[in-house]
Design a protein with these regions (language model features):
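A domain-start/cap signature at the N-terminus of enzymes
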Residues: 18-68, 99, 151-166, 170, ...
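Short substrate-entry loop that stabilizes the transition state in hydrolases
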Residues: 62-114, 186-187, 217-219
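Alpha/beta-hydrolase active-site loop
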Residues: 118-145
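Pro/Thr/Ser/Gly-rich low-complexity, intrinsically disordered linker/stalk tracts
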Residues: 333-371, 425, 439-444
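Recognizes extended acidic, P/S/T-rich segments that occur
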Residues: 374-426
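Beta-strand-rich modules
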Residues: 420-441
């Protein structure tokens, strides 16, 4: 395959890199507030053997970032390519915006049949590449504090291995970590990769191990029936030492991410509220435990065990799972039942509606709790159309940006744009755009 040189510029310094194979050609825009850096593969021992790009989103009006939320894809070309849109996800942006954090999505350019461990084990060079990207993106975005702020890590499959590995390598930097369908190898794990030492500092990091029930939780056979067998030793190694770790299972899914974001984002929200320091450069705050809830492990797989305040729990810590708050405990119970976590909050109203001829464009933010399902457009006081007109999502609740297997918007990105083909020429119509979240609630 022909490869062409590409000139990239970071902080005014031109460097020569090589373009990606066709499957990784990235057409997703990276203009402010988005920023991107890409590194070519290295031939040096111990460094990353695959090319990688990192896309960063910075919320408007933030003078100094408090942290960075990292959305890490899994293994294989399809999952790796999904990382190209991760920083554009409006729902994850809502979480980052609330806590004055950036949102970062890597794309490791792993060939389909190549060894995923060569990037998803951060000891194989991806940790160093990540740290370099934070420095370079901090410079190009005008936020040099990016290289020292805490991280909130989300990872799917191989990304779960990566995020868990970063908890073990850099516990002082990780505010919280959500591991979907994957975890790194520790003593007792069946994985063949080199095991990690569980450092005491890692036990202070809130972690959630999340799976689909058909990944060996209640359904033991099938392609992904062995996933829980790899995750369970990690969970037990942590919880037996008193770690702040929980586990949850989607009753509707296997390896696809499904509706996990409706628990992951509230969980991450609670953890960031407990952990992020107000002053950049200060250490992460330790979780006091006064607001924590626990769930007895016996029967957790089907949601039969009820959460209870940790302060009144009389059982062994190692025989329970940890949750950061009563609100998250309530959401956990509903998620374990059917993933239909309720929401009573209205989404933010759209802004910046422009009408040029019969073309409407606007901007909108997602609801923190339930994301953005779509829009209702009114013309002259009456409903004109509901967008999307035919909502589809085979992996979970229908959302405006659509949803990939790996929890990112599909390509091409869906624009906030509508052409009113029935507009009367020469007449000035009055339009209104209303946001609708995935709980069905409308903006005012």
């Amino acid at each position: 395959m022909t490869r062409f040189p590409l000139i990239a510029c970071i902080a005014g310094l031109p460097t020569v890199v090589w373009s990606a194979p066709d499957v990784y050609q990235n057409t997703v825009p990276a203009e402010p507030p988005y920023y991107r850096v890409r590194y070519e593969k290295s031939e040096k021992t111990g460094e990353l053997v695959y090319p990688v790009s990192y896309t960063l989103w910075v919320p408007e009006g933030v003078r100094e970032l408090r942290g960075v939320v990292v959305h890490q894809h899994g293994c294989g070309e399809g999952s790796c390519k999904s990382g190209q849109t991760g920083a554009h996800d409006l729902h994850w942006q809502a979480l980052a915006r609330k806590h004055r954090c950036a949102l970062l999505s890597p794309t490791y350019e792993q060939p389909e049949k190549a060894d995923c461990q060569l990037w998803c084990d951060p000891r194989n060079g991806s940790s160093s590449a990540f740290l370099k990207a934070l420095t370079d993106l901090g410079r190009s975005s005008g936020h040099p504090e990016l290289e020292r702020v805490p991280w909130a890590l989300w990872g799917h499959s191989g990304g779960g291995h990566w995020a868990g590995g970063m908890v073990l390598l850099h516990p002082e930097r990780v505010a919280a970590a959500w591991l979907r369908s994957g975890a790194p190898a520790v003593a007792g794990s069946p994985q063949k990769s080199a095991v990690y030492e569980v450092r005491p500092e890692s036990l202070q990091v809130p972690v959630m191990c999340n799976l689909g029930t058909r990944e060996g939780v209640t359904v033991k056979d099938g392609r992904f029936g062995g996933v829980w067998g790899g995750v369970e030793p990690f969970f037990k190694a942590f919880r037996s030492r008193g770690a702040l770790i929980g586990v949850s299972a989607d009753p509707l899914t296997s390896h696809e991410c499904g509706n996990q974001r409706y628990l992951a984002i509230p969980w991450m929200d609670a953890c960031l509220s407990l952990r992020l320091p107000e002053t950049v450069g200060s250490p992460l705050r330790k979780v006091s435990g006064s607001e924590a809830w626990v769930v007895p492990l016996k029967g957790w797989e089907t949601g039969a065990s009820a959460p209870e305040p940790a302060a009144g729990y009389s059982g062994a810590v190692g025989e329970s799972l940890w949750l950061p708050s009563g609100g998250v405990a309530k959401a956990w119970s509903q998620y374990m039942k059917d993933t239909a976590i309720p929401d009573a909050t209205r989404p933010p109203a759209p802004k910046g509606l422009k009408v040029e001829g019969n073309v409407l464009t606007w901007n909108a933010e997602a609801d923190l709790e339930s994301g953005l399902a779509g829009f209702i457009i009114e013309r002259d006081g009456a409903v004109l159309v509901k967008l999307p007109e035919q909502p589809k999502n085979p992996f979970g609740r229908p959302i405006f940006q659509n949803l990939s297997y790996s929890d990112t918007p599909t390509q091409p990105l869906v624009p906030m744009r509508y052409v009113d083909a029935a507009a009367v020429p020469g007449k000035t119509h009055q339009y209104r755009v209303i946001s609708v979240n995935t709980a069905g609630l409308q903006s005012r």
